[in-house]
Amino acid sequence: MAASGVEKSSKKKTEKKLAAREEAKLLAGFMGVMNNMRKQKTLCDVILMVQERKIPAHRVVLAAASHFFNLMFTTNMLESKSFEVELKDAEPDIIEQLVEFAYTARISVNSNNVQSLLDAANQYQIEPVKKMCVDFLKEQVDASNCLGISVLAECLDCPELKATADDFIHQHFTEVYKTDEFLQLDVKRVTHLLNQDTLTVRAEDQVYDAAVRWLKYDEPNRQPFMVDILAKVRFPLISKNFLSKTVQAEPLIQDNPECLKMVISGMRYHLLSPEDREELVDGTRPRRKKHDYRIALFGGSQPQSCRYFNPKDYSWTDIRCPFEKRRDAACVFWDNVVYILGGSQLFPIKRMDCYNVVKDSWYSKLGPPTPRDSLAACAAEGKIYTSGGSEVGNSALYLFECYDTRTESWHTKPSMLTQRCSHGMVEANGLIYVCGGSLGNNVSGRVLNSCEVYDPATETWTELCPMIEARKNHGLVFVKDKIFAVGGQNGLGGLDNVEYYDIKLNEWKMVSPMPWKGVTVKCAAVGSIVYVLAGFQGVGRLGHILEYNTETDKWVANSKVRAFPVTSCLICVVDTCGANEETLET
């Protein structure tokens, strides 16, 4: 009984599906017949007059497809009784396509007809076509057309399309303001745009540049709007150097007392203490940050050799470096500042050199309580952590210290489980991971494969799965829940192998080896790419940069870009958002 019941139930479901498919076929067939009747002008009861073109149709079909025609034909409007209905300000080809859609549910939307179709679909209230046009335009938004699409969406009451266009404008403002569309905007739209907190910029000087570009495009006619436009620039957020060298020298500013007052107000802001600055609200709200990640390399043993590497265009940019020579030091980046710690000349260096990438300025702070070289460092939540190292030729240390960037004070934390120097250390998801290294810098110092993790919340260390290969002087980077150990050396020589630690699984796995063996590897990761920018092979240095794609497990040797010439350099990823363009020029 039960089995037959199941069979009957299954049979009913199958019959329903077949009936639904058959119904769809029948409906398509009916509409196909009606469309043929329309083309043959059979039983048509209305003619749409569009300019000089006559388009026959059936009222019931138009009324079903369009709320506009539904109201026209079912109310007491004059057109409800007219055989010919004139559609003013309409394009014949577009109306033909909409009528065709009413019968077939098919329409071709492309870059040539989308604006006209959207306008007509909006006017005649044909929602499916309107949605198709909106979806098409959302996919086409770019820097050259986003402003026009935003205006169109506003005029045609398409909030979803406007939101997409506006979000693109704000996200890509630094590209948008350099287009012809931006220069041709009216003063109301420019003023509104420059006032947005959500403009994504590297620094406020880009907003200033946008304002000046717009004013100069038609200077005689836009002169009366100068104060209103420049009032939207947040001068206190512009660097003091840019204000004095570029803004103050601009003829537009010099010739206008009101604009000069804005610049002076911005310069005064830089003279205030941090406490007094916090009390100011007007003109100091930050914009949305446009992250600009670069890799900074500092000469170490050759301090005059300091550069940025830009992974977007593979360019090198010099950094002004006045600090002294350091051997086997470490560097980290936090909140616009690069901290250079440890290292030695004849003796360990006690001072910590600091470089502000936004202000392009150097200054010094008190370094780690225990001066040493061959240490490792990383940053997390406003704190700089240093681990291990050695005190000039001595055995490796268990030491673990922390510098609080807010209070500018050093604190000794619980020691590592294993003494180590020439190791790697990275922050990942709020935890501090330490991998590899050796027991000392002398020949007898055993190379390690051990790993451990520190939890700042509990101030405890936990031993982890060891690396497959013991290594020191290797690169160590964190990419998407994986920690990659790149090259380095074991007790026998240089390594080309690469392995990663899966944080979730607590295990190491080998991946594709480097196309080069590195006794010392200097690498950093931006996005999913690991860049090896410097290194030493034992008999020579790395000639050209190497790239490793962590998603495809592929290495590329870039023969067009020379590697950094100093193999004992320091390396870290920095965010130059906020830095003046002149500072970053190649």
Swiss-Prot record:
GO biological process, one term: protein ubiquitination
Oligomeric form and interacting partners: Homodimer. Component of the BCR(KLHL7) E3 ubiquitin ligase complex, at least composed of CUL3 and KLHL7 and RBX1.
A matching Pfam family: Kelch_KLHDC2_KLHL20_DRC7
Sorted UniProt keywords: Cytoplasm, Disease variant, Kelch repeat, Nucleus, Repeat, Retinitis pigmentosa, Ubl conjugation pathway
Medical condition linked: Perching syndrome: An autosomal recessive multisystem disorder characterized by global developmental delay, dysmorphic facial features, feeding and respiratory difficulties with poor overall growth, axial hypotonia, and joint contractures. The features are variable, even within families, and may also include retinitis pigmentosa, cardiac or genitourinary anomalies, and abnormal sweating. Retinitis pigmentosa 42: A retinal dystrophy belonging to the group of pigmentary retinopathies. Retinitis pigmentosa is characterized by retinal pigment deposits visible on fundus examination and primary loss of rod photoreceptor cells followed by secondary loss of cone photoreceptors. Patients typically have night vision blindness and loss of midperipheral visual field. As their condition progresses, they lose their far peripheral visual field and eventually central vision as well.
One annotated Gene Ontology cellular component of this protein: nucleolus
Tissues expressed in: Widely expressed, with highest levels in adult and fetal heart, CNS and adult testis.
Major localization listed first in the record, in broad terms: nucleus
Impact noted for substituting residue 472 to Q: In a patient with retinitis pigmentosa; uncertain significance
InterPro entries for this protein: BACK (IPR011705), BTB-kelch_protein (IPR017096), BTB/POZ_dom (IPR000210), BTB/POZ_KLHL7 (IPR030599), Kelch-typ_b-propeller (IPR015915), Kelch_1 (IPR006652), KLHL7_BACK (IPR047060), SKP1/BTB/POZ_sf (IPR011333)
Ranges where the BTB domain occurs: 44-111
Documented effect of changing residue 153 to V: In RP42; impairs interaction with CUL3 and ubiquitin ligase activity of the BCR(KLHL7) complex
PROSITE patterns: BTB
Pathway the protein takes part in: Protein modification; protein ubiquitination
Kelch-type repeats, residues: 294-336, 337-382, 383-430, 431-481, 483-528, 530-575
The name this protein goes by in its record: Kelch-like protein 7
GO molecular function, one term: ubiquitin-like ligase-substrate adaptor activity
Source organism superkingdom: Eukaryota
Compartment(s) where it occurs, according to its Swiss-Prot or TrEMBL record: Nucleus; Cytoplasm
Functional note: Substrate-specific adapter of a BCR (BTB-CUL3-RBX1) E3 ubiquitin ligase complex. The BCR(KLHL7) complex acts by mediating ubiquitination and subsequent degradation of substrate proteins. Probably mediates 'Lys-48'-linked ubiquitination.
Coiled-coil regions, chain positions: none
Domain BACK, first and last residues per copy: 146-248
